[in-house]
Design a protein with these regions (language model features):
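N-terminal membrane-sensor/transducer module of prokaryotic signaling receptors
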Residues: 2-152
Length: 152
């Protein structure tokens, strides 16, 4: 009986950890999602990837973690699952809540290194509040895929 009880507690603890992980994605999750997007794009093309993002495909949108896409030369947003009103716009010089032009930093990092992390403040779609965010960026040909997580 003691083993059954202990086993049940372990299962509950594991399940609770899994639920928590799903609610709060990690840097590893962001990297994996961006890389999954890059692999899909290489296999199916940019247009198909844009359709997946726009359709909020569960491979590329999971709660507050999602992939968006921007043109590496112009900075124009090509696809965004949470805020489609910014698609087609160049927001490169629009700062975050603290005045940081993080989108310019994203483009420069993508052009120079091809991948990396950028920190800034952004509205969390889950909480509705401006929160610290870090985004993994990955260059794929002429676009930048971005997948970010909110810091706690």
């Amino acid at each position: 009986m003691k083993r059954l009880f202990t086993g049940s507690l372990l299962c509950l603890a594991f399940a609770a950890g899994s639920v928590n992980a799903a609610i709060e994605p990690t840097e590893k999750d962001a990297i994996a999602m961006a890389e999954r997007g890059a692999a899909f794009m290489k296999a199916h093309g940019k247009e198909e990837m844009m359709k997946k993002i726009t359709a909020k495909d569960p491979d590329f949108v999971q709660g507050s973690l999602y992939v968006d896409m921007r043109d590496i030369k112009t900075g124009i947003v090509l696809a965004h699952p949470i805020n489609p009103s910014i698609v087609g716009k160049d927001l490169t010089d629009v700062p975050d809540a603290n005045g940081k032009k993080y989108r310019r930093e994203i483009i420069e990092l993508a052009q120079k290194q091809g991948k990396g992390w950028v920190d800034y403040q952004y509205k969390n779609p889950t909480s509705g509040k401006i929160e610290p965010k870090t985004t993994y960026i990955l260059r794929v040909k002429d676009v930048v895929l971005e997948a970010g997580i909110y810091k706690k």
